[in-house]
């Protein structure tokens, strides 16, 4: 793992001892914010609740959407990010997606990154008042990478680059993708950065049933009915026509419908299953 933390070490807070015997050191509190796509906006409510009860983290580490929420908090722009999140509607979310037909992901990611930078600004991680890091995965090696320097939006973008959906992000000489591939809820990273108490937020818990195995009875090979077979043969041609058609059709193909999931929903659901299993193994 790449551990290049060069930021300032936050001073340990001292609180008066109730019996007048000097001071008592507060433990260093770490926050590990997990991935989970749109479910991750729940991290905002959790952060506000912690702060309302006087629990202020000294270390924040985020994976995927957790990196976005954690970075906004560390930079002091949680309100702006929440305002933007609340403004998202099905009719305008597509405007943030720069669709690509010949890249390593369906979405380039530049539009979304620009919107995040408009909300958070060109802040550097090493200039933040608290320790902050994001978790990403190196594509070629599978190594877990901790991003602790550079532009905060770049670190966020690398951490949420869901394979197949978003294009990988080049950081230094490494191509990085979503950190949830290796560490969905980065408790280990928070501890490595000095947290003595870690509050972990796993928004993907119980999304899928635990330990459920479904046995299918029947033949292992199913021969489709003639009309089904002809439908399957015609599907690729229709897919190509739709791919180059109007925006409304592209939205339908990308997000899918109740009857048939789209490309995005299939990939995200598959990723969520993997993420849930890894999280349960690591926590």
For each of these PLM feature ranges, what is it?
Residues 1-60, 267:
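Helix-rich "cap/lid" substructures immediately adjacent to catalytic or cofactor-binding pockets
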Residues 2-10, 25-29, 78-115, 137-151, ...:
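Non-catalytic peripheral regions of patatin-like phospholipases
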Residues 34, 43, 56-75, 183:
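Catalytic nucleophile loop
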Residues 36, 46, 66, 134, ...:
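Conserved small-residue
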Residues 45-53, 75-80, 150-153:
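A glycine- and small-aliphatic-rich helix-loop capping segment at beta-alpha/alpha-beta transitions
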Residues 117, 154-168, 179-186:
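Active-site glycine-rich loop that binds ribose-phosphate moieties when present
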Residues 120-131:
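A short alpha-helix-loop-beta-strand transition element characteristic
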């Amino acid at each position: 793992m790449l551990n290049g933390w060069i930021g300032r070490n936050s001073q340990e807070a001292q609180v008066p001892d109730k019996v007048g015997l000097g001071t008592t050191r507060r433990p260093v509190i770490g926050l590990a914010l997990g991935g989970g796509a749109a479910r991750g906006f729940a991290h905002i409510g959790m952060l506000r609740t912690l702060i309302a009860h006087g629990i202020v983290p000294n270390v924040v580490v985020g994976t995927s959407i957790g990196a976005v929420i954690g970075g906004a908090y560390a930079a002091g722009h949680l309100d702006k990010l929440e305002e933007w999140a609340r403004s998202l509607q099905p009719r305008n979310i597509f405007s943030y997606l720069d669709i690509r037909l010949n890249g390593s992901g369906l979405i380039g990611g530049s539009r979304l990154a620009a919107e995040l930078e408009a909300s958070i600004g060109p802040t550097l991680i090493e200039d933040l008042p608290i320790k902050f890091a994001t978790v990403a995965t190196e594509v070629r090696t599978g190594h877990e990478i901790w991003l602790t320097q550079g532009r905060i939006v770049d670190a966020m973008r690398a951490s949420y680059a869901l394979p197949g959906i978003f294009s990988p992000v080049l950081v230094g000489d490494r191509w990085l993708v979503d950190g949830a591939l290796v560490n969905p809820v980065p408790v280990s990273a928070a501890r490595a950065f000095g947290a003595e108490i870690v509050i972990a937020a796993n928004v993907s818990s119980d999304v899928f049933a635990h330990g459920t195995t479904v046995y299918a009875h029947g033949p292992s090979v199913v021969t489709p009915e003639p009309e089904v077979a002809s439908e399957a043969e015609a599907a690729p041609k229709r897919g190509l026509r739709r791919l180059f058609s109007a925006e409304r059709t592209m939205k339908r193909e990308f997000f899918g419908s109740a009857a048939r999931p789209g490309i995005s929903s299939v990939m995200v659901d598959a990723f969520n299953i993997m993420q849930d299993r890894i999280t349960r193994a690591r926590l």
